[in-house]
């Protein structure tokens, strides 16, 4: 049962773009253009596809405001917000790994300097 549950979770968690979109929506509602800037090197086509997929899975809601010009914002649903602790744990692990990697790199440089 656990393996099946892990596979289900990884269908979402293994997608880099969706995790970055989630990260940015945890701070509040965002327009597509704001998300594109925040996420970084993502095409509009890929961003739109991921937003639609996340909406289809109930992780975010698309809100259309009847203004001129038309304004569309995305916000996390309650289900989407349940991923916040998961993202926090991933961030903590990433920070820990980054620190370990820096120490390993520094040690390798010192070793190379000592043995040259």
Cite the ranges covered by each PLM segment.
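DNA major-groove recognition helices of helix-turn-helix
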Residues: 54
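Amphipathic alpha-helical dimerization/coiled-coil segments
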Residues: 5, 23, 82-116
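N-terminal helix-turn-helix DNA-binding core of bacterial DNA-binding proteins
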Residues: 2-46, 66-73, 104
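Residues within the DNA-recognition helix of helix-turn-helix
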Residues: 50
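Basic, amphipathic "hinge/linker" alpha-helix immediately C-terminal to the N-terminal HTH DNA-binding motif
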Residues: 66-90
């Amino acid at each position: 049962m656990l393996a099946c549950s892990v596979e289900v979770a990884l269908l979402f968690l293994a997608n880099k773009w969706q995790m970055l979109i989630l990260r940015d929506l945890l701070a509040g509602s965002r327009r597509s253009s704001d998300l594109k800037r925040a996420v970084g090197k993502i095409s509009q086509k890929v961003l739109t596809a991921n937003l639609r997929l996340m909406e289809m899975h109930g992780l975010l809601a698309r809100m259309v405001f009847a203004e001129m010009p038309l304004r569309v914002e995305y916000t996390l649903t309650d289900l989407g917000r349940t991923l916040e602790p998961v993202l926090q744990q991933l961030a903590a692990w990433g920070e820990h790994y980054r620190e370990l990697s820096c120490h390993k790199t520094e040690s390798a440089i010192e070793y190379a300097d000592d043995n040259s």
